[in-house]
Design a protein with these regions (language model features):
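C-terminal transmembrane helical hairpin of 12-TM major facilitator-type secondary transporters
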Residues: 275-319
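Hydrophobic core of transmembrane alpha-helices in multi-pass small-molecule transporters
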Residues: 19, 100-116, 219, 300-314
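Central cavity-lining transmembrane alpha-helices of secondary-active solute carriers
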Residues: 49-67, 252-264
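Helix-to-loop junctions at the C-terminal end of transmembrane segments
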Residues: 61-74, 161, 261-273, 357
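Cytoplasmic helix-loop-helix junction between adjacent transmembrane helices
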Residues: 109-144
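A late C-terminal transmembrane helix in Major Facilitator Superfamily
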Residues: 329-359
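Helix-loop boundary and gating motifs at the non-cytosolic
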Residues: 2-55, 225-239
Length: 395
């Protein structure tokens, strides 16, 4: 971790901005299903109404934000939309008493809040380019901030709920929002925007198949992770009979390894190539899922969690740079494709897990997760000839 003192002040502030954004989002997003059932006393199936509304709105908003950034819209003016949406929804959640209000007010605000990470990722890339910095390394640092925040946010949020209630948790999120607003004001220069010139096209813009394939590859990894995380607690405790602390310990080991591997993934990519790193990650993902399906003891689960942390750290460290490389003159759109693959993959994994487990078993869910990783590997191999575009290439 000796890279921290070497960071320029502005880069360190951008990382802090991303950490604060992710901390705030992670403090609310995982808790919403729990709040719907326990706080609003709604039926569990009604969680799907909320998720089914937030997800498409988030995908659309991410795409919209990416287009604005690529069209030289000021980063600061765009990000304030996300910041204010987060602060407003945190305050409103302290007063929400019905599912209808949640769907009408909170869901749209949550989608606007969710676009913040993508905007900061694009901001970090644009700043790195304009300063002549290593873009892949800056991307990995930004992704590391997201992982660190998600290690902290949900745990703290659920702890506050358990001890003080939902209102206190939402007020804590509101406090994070105020810090987020302060950093927005300090970190982002008022006139900062993309300086890239886009190639002029006549008629309808052609489809960037390389970018779509890169996004599809990320989708396979995220579905693998989402299927496993959704099924893991019930598989370990109910189907396998492991101690109740196993899921939490396993996740802690995975997250710890993930953070360190993210930092090293860029160096590995410099040696063997980004696509090769993703191919290695896909192999490790498939192997770890199959091994998890065979565990019978706590030590086995923790040992395989090390492998899981390595695969996900490799993926997380290079994925955004891999996607952005297929649209170098459209970093906003590329980042939107990356972020949408995360949201969409998470939704597909969590929803399909329930259907698969109900029809078969949680062990089958893990085998399905392995299959998703193999699919990502197949896409990477089958598209070896689809190379990233040059900076001045067409979109």
């Amino acid at each position: 971790m000796n890279f921290v003192p070497q960071l320029p002040r502005q880069v360190a502030l951008i990382l802090l901005l991303q950490f604060t954004n992710s901390l705030g989002v992670s403090a609310l997003v995982p808790m919403m299903s729990f709040f719907i059932v326990e706080g609003l006393k709604a039926e569990p199936w009604q969680i799907g109404l909320y998720s089914g509304l937030v997800m498409p709105l988030t995908l659309a908003v991410n795409r919209w934000a990416g287009e604005r950034l690529d069209n030289h819209f000021p980063v600061k003016r765009l990000l304030i939309v996300s910041v204010l949406a987060y602060i407003t929804l945190s305050a409103l959640l302290t007063q929400v008493t019905s599912l209808l209000i949640l769907l009408v007010l909170i869901a749209p605000l949550m989608s606007l809040s969710n676009m913040g990470a993508g905007v900061v990722f694009t901001f970090g890339r644009l700043y790195a380019e304009q300063q002549g910095m290593d873009v892949a390394r800056v991307n990995s640092w930004l992704r590391m901030m997201v992982s660190l925040a998600w290690m902290i946010g949900p745990a703290v949020s659920f702890s506050v709920v358990a001890r003080f209630g939902f209102v206190s948790a939402f007020l804590s999120a509101f406090g994070i929002g105020i810090v987020y607003l302060t950093l927005w004001y300090i970190v982002i220069p008022s006139g900062f925007r993309s300086t890239r010139e886009r190639r002029k096209t006549t008629g309808r813009e052609p489809i960037n198949w390389g970018l779509q394939i890169a996004g599809l590859t990320c989708l396979g990894f995220v579905i693998t992770n989402s299927l496993f995380v959704s099924a893991m607690p019930l598989f370990f405790v109910h189907e396998t009979g492991l101690p109740g602390a196993t899921p939490g310990l396993s996740l802690s080991v995975k997250c710890l390894l993930e953070v360190f591997v993210i930092f090293g993934s860029v160096r590995l990519a410099e040696r063997i190539g980004t696509r090769q790193v993703l191919m290695l990650a896909a192999c490790l993902a498939a192997i770890s899922m199959v091994l998890f399906a065979q565990v019978t003891a706590l030590w086995q689960a923790l040992a395989i969690s090390v492998l899981e942390g390595v695969y996900y750290g490799l993926f997380a460290g290079v994925a955004i740079s891999f996607v952005q490389s297929y649209a170098p003159d459209r970093p906003g759109r590329a980042t939107a494709v990356y972020m949408n693959s995360l949201f969409l993959g998470g939704m597909i994994g969590s929803v399909s897990m329930g259907f698969i487990a109900s029809a078969t078993s949680f062990q089958t869910v893990l085998y399905t997760a392995a299959f998703s990783a193999v699919t990502a590997l197949f896409v990477l191999i089958a598209t070896l000839k689809v190379q990233p575009k040059a900076v001045d290439g067409s979109v």
